[in-house]
Amino acid sequence: MNWAKRSAFFLISVACFLADYYSKYWALTELGARKIVVNTYMNFILAFNHGAAFSFLARAGGWQRWLFAGFAGIVALWLIMTLLTKSHHWLMSVSYACILGGAVGNLYDRVVYGYVIDFIQWHYRTFYWPVFNLADVAITLGVILMLIAELHRR
């Protein structure tokens, strides 16, 4: 894979990171303690997640901050090295780029704030999905694209 293609994939990562960063900045400065009802199924509400996905280990006492930050850092470094050194189907590279941008977005929060800033809430009637952010969306999209690329490969 040439440098132009590699650069394009890193631009995807940077775009994911910046979308996450500025959306969290908006959430921090505009939401505060209030909730914005977007539509029947979605709200914007500020939440600070000290754990991992679905607040896993959120009340573990603080050590989990560095565990999750270390894990995200290792994943980010592996993704960077993979994008730089290996040639993949373009869809697999896009999936890596999305995951990288999302991982760095949440890693930034953990290192700077000690928690991840979440603000998107989906719900249906009385069922509420855990609050999440655009980094989580990028990671999820990356995993879905990875599965599609893998199925396409076979």
Swiss-Prot record:
Q: PROSITE patterns, alphabetically?
A: SPASE_II
Q: How does it sit in the membrane?
A: Multi-pass membrane protein
Pfam families the UniProt entry points to: Peptidase_A8 (PF01252)
Query: Which stretches are transmembrane?
Result: 8-28, 36-56, 66-86, 88-108, 129-149
Q: Where in or outside the cell is it found? A: Cell inner membrane
Q: Which domain of life is it from?
A: Bacteria
Instruction: Show the GO cellular component annotation of the record.
Output: plasma membrane
**What InterPro entries does UniProt report for this protein, alphabetically?**
Peptidase_A8
UniProt keyword terms in alphabetical order: Aspartyl protease, Cell inner membrane, Cell membrane, Hydrolase, Membrane, Protease, Transmembrane, Transmembrane helix
**Which enzyme class?**
hydrolase
Molecular function terms from GO:
aspartic-type endopeptidase activity
Q: Which residues form the active site?
A: D118, D136
Q: Which pathway?
A: Protein modification; lipoprotein biosynthesis (signal peptide cleavage)
Q: Which PANTHER family does the entry mention? A: LIPOPROTEIN SIGNAL PEPTIDASE
Q: Its function?
A: This protein specifically catalyzes the removal of signal peptides from prolipoproteins.
Q: Which HAMAP family match?
A: LspA (MF_00161)
What's the family? Belongs to the peptidase A8 family.
Tell me what this protein is called: Lipoprotein signal peptidase
State the gene name recorded for this protein.
Answer: lspA
